[in-house]
Design a protein with these regions (language model features):
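A residue-level marker of the well-folded mature domains of exported/periplasmic proteins
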Residues: 1-198
Length: 198
């Protein structure tokens, strides 16, 4: 909801997920997409980048470069092909992939990142491609993310409550051991932080 508010409930969003296998990443991506579909008809997901699918994406980006349907920025990149030289998929870095997504989707207005690594990856890509008009929200709050928030490179972060998560887990385990049953969902809370409430 916070990203939708920042984007005036319209526009395209890029999702960066830290992986395609963990329950946390799957649920965050699915929940984000479901909320957009349910509440924000003028918003859509431009693409989802799963950071553990790098080999497949390296092949795709290299193929597009080699067929001429995509060109990387030439700013200081000596690895760009010249003439008939072909780019190997292994020449494509994660930075190249992020830049590819940002350049292939120039109309993206927002980005949702599923953890600290994803937040830092997209902000780094936006710095390289000089995109300063894309709203970024994500999870976690390590020192680097807080610095990005202070500088206005990140618009908001969902900060989980690790103490409550651990406490609730111990209580649930004890209740289970005593055959007392547990709630199907336990809300351990979170805090939404922005530059204004740090």
């Amino acid at each position: 909801d916070k990203l939708a508010e920042a984007m005036s409930s319209k526009g395209k969003v890029l999702i960066l997920a830290h992986d395609s296998k963990s329950m946390a990443a799957k649920e965050r991506v699915a929940g984000f997409k479901a909320e957009l579909k349910k509440k924000y008809p003028k918003m859509s997901v431009a693409s989802v980048y799963y950071m553990d699918n790098i080999e497949k994406l390296q092949k795709n980006v290299a193929a597009e470069i080699n067929t001429g349907t995509y060109a990387r920025s030439t700013d200081g990149d000596a690895r760009l092909r010249t003439g008939d030289e072909k780019i190997n998929p292994t020449d494509i870095t994660e930075d190249d992939i992020i830049d590819y997504y940002l350049q292939k989707h120039p109309d993206v207005c927002g980005c949702f990142a599923t953890n600290a690594t994803a937040v830092k990856t997209i902000v780094s890509g936006m710095d390289r491609t000089k995109k300063d008009n894309v709203m970024v929200v994500g999870y976690d709050a390590d020192k680097e993310e807080i610095d990005m928030l202070k500088k206005g490179k990140v618009d908001g972060l969902v900060v989980q409550n690790p103490y409550a998560m651990g406490y609730a887990s111990v209580i649930a385990a004890a209740r289970s051991a005593l055959s007392m049953g547990n709630e199907s969902v336990v809300d351990t809370g979170y805090t939404w932080i922005t530059k204004s409430n740090l």
